[in-house]
Amino acid sequence: MKNNKKVGTEDSTKWMLESVEIDPKGDSSVKQPESTINSNNPESSGAGGGILKNVSKNLAVGSIIRSMSVNKWRKSGNLGSPSTRKSGNLGPPLPVSQVKRPGPQRVERTTSSAARGLQSLRFLDRTVTGRERDSWRSIENRFNQFAVDGRLPKDKFGVCIGMGDTLEFAAKVYEALGRRRQIKTENGIDKEQLKLFWEDMIKKDLDCRLQIFFDMCDKDGDGKLTEEEVKEVIVLSASANRLVNLKKNAASYASLIMEELDPNEQGYIEMWQLEVLLTGIVSNADSHKVVRKSQQLTRAMIPKRYRTPTSKYVVVTAELMYEHWKKIWVVTLWLAVNVVLFMWKYEEFTTSPLYNITGRCLCAAKGTAEILKLNMALILVPVLRRTLTFLRSTFLNHLIPFDDNINFHKLIAVAIAVISLLHTALHMLCNYPRLSSCPYNFYSDYAGNLLGAKQPTYLGLMLTPVSVTGVLMIIFMGISFTLAMHYFRRNIVKLPIPFNRLAGFNSFWYAHHLLVIAYALLIIHGYILIIEKPWYQKTTWMYVAIPMVLYASERLFSRVQEHNHRVHIIKAIVYSGNVLALYMTKPQGFKYKSGMYMFVKCPDISKFEWHPFSITSAPGDEYLSVHIRALGDWTSELRNRFAETCEPHQKSKPSPNDLIRMETRARGANPHVEESQALFPRIFIKGPYGAPAQSYQKFDILLLIGLGIGATPFISILKDMLNNLKPGIPKTGQKYEGSVGGESLGGSSVYGGSSVNGGGSVNGGGSVSGGGRKFPQRAYFYWVTREQASFEWFKGVMDDIAVYDKTNVIEMHNYLTSMYEAGDARSALIAMVQKLQHAKNGVDIVSESRIRTHFARPNWRKVFSELSNKHETSRIGVFYCGSPTLVRPLKSLCQEFSLESSTRFTFHKENF
């Protein structure tokens, strides 16, 4: 880009690139403007971005550095010779004679390119950025806390400035700032020197921050980076971001950087080369800012229906009713039935003779008793898994919110707890005292015919079978309900020994079986009454009979059919991160949809415990698979049992982060399969059962969000969609040689056979498969995890999506939260290596798959904004599985963008 404006002494102190000549072949020069250099390929995070669609574009940074030459330079005064870099004032620019030398020449940033691209390069967390001046007070306090004799040692520098979780990286920054300021830091620094360091780190001057980063890499301060120095910084960055695998391969990645930036094999690279690479890394993301700003500006225009508080309230209420109408009418019906039953029984006892003694207490007690019977019956309905799974496939699925069955179960449980306590209190604190203390003649006139001629005492009333069974019910239900609470069931409550056994899934599971006794006591309590009635007026058993029979039949059916639930293990993989993947034979007649789950039992661990896990295999696979995270006692023991029988994936001794694998043959492929299975824990399954994710086919656009192991229900969905896209796979869903573990879909069958070529055409997004099933047009999968090793769980699936999804139907976004977000100095060099490595061979250095990995956490508002603008007037199904902390923000964003745009987001979450 040419600029003929005369430069004065008051001009910016930045170097300005006049023109760049690019010589693609090395023997000719073609002039290219700066805008061309910076208009690089948009970086896709999805499947399209997973494979190199144009390697030459992705390698643009390296090719520019190799072939560019500089014609004209302007004075900047910021960057001088290596000798002047060490001081605070970086000195005058090099003379023209010194600038013109053979080989690659310095390319300085311009306001339009690198100034935008590098504006996010920072040494502090984003939470501190923008509040640096205010943060100095906290730093002063920490200095006073950690300083020894008025000087802060190097090992406390990171803690003092807010980089306490990356002390090693902070120490390198400390050394670089000391060299830059020519301060001897061996014995620590005082407060004034600390303030100088802090001011250097927070300067808005891009050159200053880049210079600090270069000085941190340039350990000997000679102005040149050797391969060993680059390797050292890569190791440092990998440690700061907890990337163990990247740390192992630091030498090869350093060699890759030198290969790209040092084509003449001089043995070093210079600051300007590093700067150009940094600019190329981040400038792509900047190219979309104008579009995003215009979208935000459009969103800022307030719709007419929002301009008054009343109209806004009406619109929001209407939207909420539209979104949750099924839940609203079911809960309303439930409340109405409870109110009607209460009022009916209340009015009935206003005419009872006992009303003259007890007053309204008796009426209220009988009213609560009636609705307690109803709710003790209803609470069993949401846990009739087989029945609900069947009903999901009927027209009732359009009327009843089966996805909220667990929430409705919890709602009724809360109602039962409140009603039971109220019913008990009315009897013990009102009815019994009045009956036992009223005048005898009063008692004889109104209660003698019903309760007997002898007036009972309070203790006598408390010792009646009705009272005893009622109190026992309260005790059993109280224990069961308490241990079912989230804090106990998830073992969040840390109780002292030996009470620690009262928390966890096992306690929840066994305590719930106390309710069998509670139901028996309920029937006795409702049959042996103080006031005698004929049997047909004792209605408690009538309420609970049908739900109890249905529940008992489901449990009994599972026990009777248990011999058919035995499966054989095809393969088991124990991953680092305490994750066990089980691949097992599929029982005959076991039909399921993607998104469903099943129960798994290991009798060798416990004969009675069944645990639910999402199915990760596709319906068309000949095998079943589940991925189990070892969190509790049972899952940890299961993982350990299989780990004992596993063999290392490689012959060499594996490191703690390597995979451990065990493989067996499936039934039919090995005549001695029963003998081989004797080595491994026995596994039984039952199911499948319906889950919210199975309704994904109702939507044309999917947004799948999984946190950690919460990705499991969506892996089955992605495999099913990929089955529809992959050539040579039958679309009827009968046989599918899918990926097992980390193996590719294109590999051999898990049974040792060749892949099956099925009929049916390869369909694009949103088409109907050969089997008549409708598939979504697009699927966006966001997988957020905090451990690099987690990507190994579904590496094969990610690679297959990158290879076979030619039309970008599936777009994957992997996020690693242990890494510092893009623009942070602690992850800057890793971003460079990621770009170069992916451009070279199409493999991501973080996930070691073909799908690019993003740093830190997603900006969910940005995700929803982009989808709403990309898919206007569409219905997007948002499916989430993971930590409950993200449920409320995602649900709020769905409601917000459904109101403010023409796109409608429908939120679903798993209920495990």
UniProtKB/Swiss-Prot annotation:
- Annotated segments matching region EF-hand-like 2: 181-193
Q: Where is the EF-hand domain?
A: 205-240
**Which intervals hold domain FAD-binding FR-type?**
562-695
Pfam families for this protein? FAD_binding_8, Ferric_reduct, NAD_binding_6, NADPH_Ox
Q: Which SUPFAM superfamilies match?
A: EF-hand (SSF47473), Ferredoxin reductase-like, C-terminal NADP-linked domain (SSF52343), Riboflavin synthase domain-like (SSF63380)
Q: Where are the transmembrane segments?
A: 324-344, 364-384, 411-431, 459-479, 511-531, 698-718
Name assigned to this protein? Putative respiratory burst oxidase homolog protein J
What is the organism field in this record? Arabidopsis thaliana (Mouse-ear cress)
Q: What gene name does this entry carry? A: RBOHJ
